[in-house]
Curated annotation (Swiss-Prot):
To E.coli YahC. The keyword Membrane applies. The chain crosses the membrane at residues 3-23, 25-45, 49-69, 72-92, 99-119, 123-143. The keyword Cell division does not apply. Residues 24, 70-71, 120-122 are periplasmic. Its main location: membrane. The lineage of its organism: Bacteria, Pseudomonadati, Pseudomonadota, Gammaproteobacteria, Enterobacterales. This is Inner membrane protein YcdZ. It comes from Escherichia coli (strain K12).
Length: 163
């Protein structure tokens, strides 16, 4: 079984489970899928990728709240919101000089989820975090399944060759 098929199988199964978990816990299922997406899209895999994805998602949530609260300081002055957004977007990118914050799309995913969740970071954050863990489980269980399948196929071939 190839890697893509293995990951597709585990992602399909765990996506269904995530949908149930999200509803059961009162979380945002769509935000959880954004957490999954962050892990899959991160160029680093394994625990390092999980840590980088978590740090960038969290930073995105924080940056979104800076924009939301900063813009609310002077709601009658619309230009302030635009200036704050521009400055924060710059900072969201430049922070990537730090290893744990090096996945810029993760930062923007966290911010966008917070905006879509209308600034309810207390709901967005656990939804993203649990979704991120599901993404880690989806990909790594798929890689495990592919490796196990390859090992089994190799053993079967050795048995055929000996016969």
């Amino acid at each position: 079984m190839n890697i893509l098929l293995s990951i597709a199988i585990t992602t399909g199964i765990l996506s269904g489970i995530w949908g149930w978990v999200a509803v059961s816990l009162g979380l945002l299922s769509w935000a959880g899928f954004l957490g999954c997406t962050a892990y899959f899209a991160c160029p680093q895999g394994g625990l390092k990728g999980l840590a980088i994805s978590a740090a960038t998602l969290l930073s995105g949530v924080v940056w979104a709240m800076v924009i939301i609260y900063g813009s609310a300081l002077a709601p009658h002055l619309e230009i302030l919101g635009y200036v704050i957004t521009g400055i924060v977007a710059f900072l969201m990118c430049i922070q990537a000089k730090q290893l744990l914050l090096s996945f810029v799309p993760g930062t923007f995913i966290g911010a966008c989820a917070t905006f879509a969740g209308q600034g309810d970071w207390k709901l967005v954050l656990p939804s993203l975090a649990l979704g991120l863990i599901f993404g880690y489980a989806m990909k790594n269980s798929g890689l495990w399944l592919a490796a196990r399948s390859a090992k089994t196929a190799h053993r079967e071939q050795e048995i055929k060759n000996k016969a």
